[in-house]
């Protein structure tokens, strides 16, 4: 069981597209594995978040605001995982499906969870001089998401998968930014 979990993480990190074709990964245990991967990456994400906040404070860009406590960060991150999966499901399955697309929401949710595996390497960002590594890890995450979405939605090219995978976080981030700006006004 733990071996299967590690196998999923390693195959996702290696961008192995056969991970997403294996029906055994989409059973009930697959959903729980993806949930555990997301929670682990959220816990690890606190390291670069703290480094980023201290860097922003040194530059004078973060003044007086308190960072999110862990419970709120966990809840918000799980909510964003769910919203991102809904967005990818609606756009990829309902709006722009391929003729061979036969996918349910749970499969998309599980795939997005598996794609979070490269974010485990965020623990390496422990110093502000390493902050640019977040970009590399994020590109790796988007690549894993593109491979997964391309396989489960049976797209012929990866451009469609990239647009769906990359636009979802951008729309969510922009929406949250607008929401927080309106709340602070």
Question: Where do the model's predicted regions map?
Answer:
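Selected alpha-helical membrane-embedding segments in polytopic membrane proteins
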Residues: 1-103
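Juxtamembrane boundary at the C-terminal end of a transmembrane helix
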Residues: 173-185
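Short alpha-helical linear motifs
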Residues: 32, 57-61, 129-135, 160, ...
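Transmembrane helix-loop junctions in multi-pass membrane proteins
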Residues: 47-59, 120-129, 182-183
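Hydrophobic alpha-helical transmembrane segments and adjacent short intramembrane/lumenal linkers
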Residues: 89-176
